[in-house]
Curated annotation (Swiss-Prot):
Catalyzes the deamination of dCTP to dUTP. GO terms for biological process: dUMP biosynthetic process; dUTP biosynthetic process; nucleobase-containing small molecule interconversion. It comes from Helicobacter pylori (strain Shi470). This is dCTP deaminase. NCBIfam families: dCTP_deam. One of its GO terms (molecular function) is dCTP deaminase activity. It catalyses: dCTP + H2O + H(+) = dUTP + NH4(+). Belongs to the dCTP deaminase family.
Length: 188
């Protein structure tokens, strides 16, 4: 399994729509960087956030109650205030169409990590298609700003030595084609 370079990421995005919209260079002046890098792509977080609150005493991933969240639109302010020790969901500006022979792994940006803001995203499986739901945790005891429409994490692409027998699309992945922030789902 090989790590893919900028030239491959660019080709797959421009010719096959792997990342859309696609920024062909790294943008980093006066913003948290995003766009193409040497061996990855820095994704941007949108302006819609879902803050987990304490309306109910329990989060159950098998029976998730959307009333446990508050939707926040940060498009006017340009940022979202994540309270101390809080958790929120967001989504990428970019839409992904993964090739059948490629898996992507997403890692948080050091700019946020050095402020105690941890970003988690599960792997983008072969033939996954959709916007990416991003999990954001503020591990500090202070409120923190998360900037809308700026970089939030970096995606690296690993191409397999052979094509998988069954992709995420083939097995009817429950988050296939997701748009916006997608809450936990259990197939029934």
């Amino acid at each position: 399994m090989g790590l893919k370079a900028d030239s491959w990421i660019k080709k797959m995005s421009l010719e096959h729509g792997m990342i859309s919209p696609f920024c062909e260079k790294q943008i980093g002046k006066d913003v948290i960087s995003y766009g193409l890098s040497s061996y990855g792509y820095d994704i941007r977080v949108g302006s819609e956030f879902m803050l987990f609150d304490n309306k109910n005493a329990l989060i159950d991933p098998k029976n998730f109650d959307p009333n446990n969240t508050t939707k926040i639109d940060a498009s006017k302010e340009g940022f979202f205030i994540l309270p101390a020790n809080a958790f929120a969901l967001a989504h990428t500006i970019e839409y992904f169409k993964m090739p059948k022979d490629t898996l992507a792994i997403c890692l948080g940006k050091s700019t946020y990590a050095r402020c105690g803001i941890i970003v988690n995203v599960t792997p983008f499986e072969p033939e996954f298609e959709g916007y990416i739901t991003i999990e954001i945790s503020n591990t500090t005891n202070l409120p923190a700003k998360v900037y809308a429409n700026e970089g939030i994490a970096q995606v690296v692409f690993l191409q397999g030595d052979e094509v998988c027998e069954q992709s995420y699309k083939d097995r009817g992945g429950k988050y296939q084609g997701q748009v916006g922030i997608t809450l936990p789902k259990i197939l029934k």
